[in-house]
Swiss-Prot record:
Entry's Gene Ontology cellular component terms: small ribosomal subunit
BP GO terms, sorted: translation
Entry superkingdom: Bacteria
Subunit and partners: Part of the 30S ribosomal subunit. Contacts proteins S9 and S11.
Function (record text): One of the primary rRNA binding proteins, it binds directly to 16S rRNA where it nucleates assembly of the head domain of the 30S subunit. Is located at the subunit interface close to the decoding center, probably blocks exit of the E-site tRNA.
Record-linked InterPro entries: Ribosomal_uS7, Ribosomal_uS7_bac/org-type, Ribosomal_uS7_CS, Ribosomal_uS7_dom, Ribosomal_uS7_dom_sf
Name assigned to this protein: Small ribosomal subunit protein uS7
Family: Belongs to the universal ribosomal protein uS7 family.
Family matches, as SUPFAM superfamilies: Ribosomal protein S7
GO molecular function, one term: structural constituent of ribosome
PANTHER family according to UniProt: RIBOSOMAL PROTEIN S7
Amino acid sequence: MRRRKAPVREVLGDPIYNNKVVTKFINKMMLDGKKSVSEKIIYAAFDKIEEKSGEKGIEVFEKALERVKPLVEVRSRRVGGATYQVPVEVRPARQQSLSIRWLLEATRKRNERTMIERLASELVDAANERGAAFKKKEDVHKMAEANKAFAHYRW
């Protein structure tokens, strides 16, 4: 384990919207250090969303992230030889990183032709409470609800 807690580094806002969450999404989507490719994809997806739905791409993005954020999750805890799935609340920073991760996983698994189309579709779906990322959040919440009896094992 670490001696000290790792310092949380501040990210700068992205070049167009000056939004830190968009920057985090761009960084998480980036493969092989190709940040410019990642930026092009996300901005093109925002344009595609505006084209399709008439809503601003950044607003749909923020709504999608908000809808995918988990409030509770389960953590494994061993008690006397048995492993229990204990429901715990999710801290805000983890809520954000999980929602970004789930949106990207769901986007990469979609069947549309280009990443731009996949990302745009997944963001619109998540904003409208459908899609794989939203389903993932619902599944996590169901697991926590099902294991509510073990909540007293929290740490």
